[in-house]
Amino acid sequence: MNGLGMQKFEHPLNERTRIYLRIESLFRKLGHSADLTQPFEYQVFFSSLFNMLDILEQVQVKAELGKDLEKLRLQYRAWMDIEGVDQSALLSVLEQISQVHQNLMQTTRPGHSLKEDRFLSALKQRFFIPGGDCCFDLPALHHWLHLPLEVRCRNTHNWMAQLLSLSDALSLWLRLTRETARFEPQIARNGFMQSEMENANLLRLEIPIDQGVYPMISGHKSRFALRFMSFETNKNCEKDIEFTLAVC
């Protein structure tokens, strides 16, 4: 259909999902940079880690995610009485939900042990000063960067391991949420579309890259509106845009 492929966008329909997506993005950056294979990957790793700790300090993610996993568990249990449902697959999902929920609830507040780490604590205080990672600003970091790679990688993976229960629980909730809806073809007339739905958490869009547009979306759990913008002009797109949409 087009030579450039598809671009994907996701838009949260409540603040809780917004936070979950931000945390997922930070986990992805941590995972990609933890092996420190490139000279400045430590900057991506530490900035992502410290952003994560700030979110976890401000928001009761463990409690909210625990509630959402319990809601999912009840929804899936209700499907056990529906004829034609694959019971083995359903039981597998229920087991996964129970396991990650148990692991999450058994941990202390996510990120607390990292906050108490003296090296990370000292580093975090000055890391976001513009250009503040010079050796005279952060001599401890300068020393750490000269340790053997295997030592530094062991550190980064140990720090990430302390967030593993949160990562597993969040990944499962987002995966199951995304799987609740299929992509359906849509047309935004004159670049605009609005619709109503019930208790949705997330919008997912796939748009051909060669359309040259990106979406501006507003909405909540029962209603949304989207307007496509031209990348070249940064103005409203006035043409019809074909895309696919999943309301999760």
From Swiss-Prot:
Interacts with FtsZ. Its main location: cytoplasm. One of its GO terms (cellular component) is cell division site. Gene3D superfamilies: YacF-like (1.10.3900.10), YacF-like domains (2.60.440.10). Keywords: Cell cycle, Cell division, Cytoplasm, Septation. GO terms for biological process: division septum assembly; FtsZ-dependent cytokinesis. Cell division factor that enhances FtsZ-ring assembly. Directly interacts with FtsZ and promotes bundling of FtsZ protofilaments, with a reduction in FtsZ GTPase activity. The gene is zapD. This is Cell division protein ZapD. Belongs to the ZapD family. It holds the Pfam family ZapD.
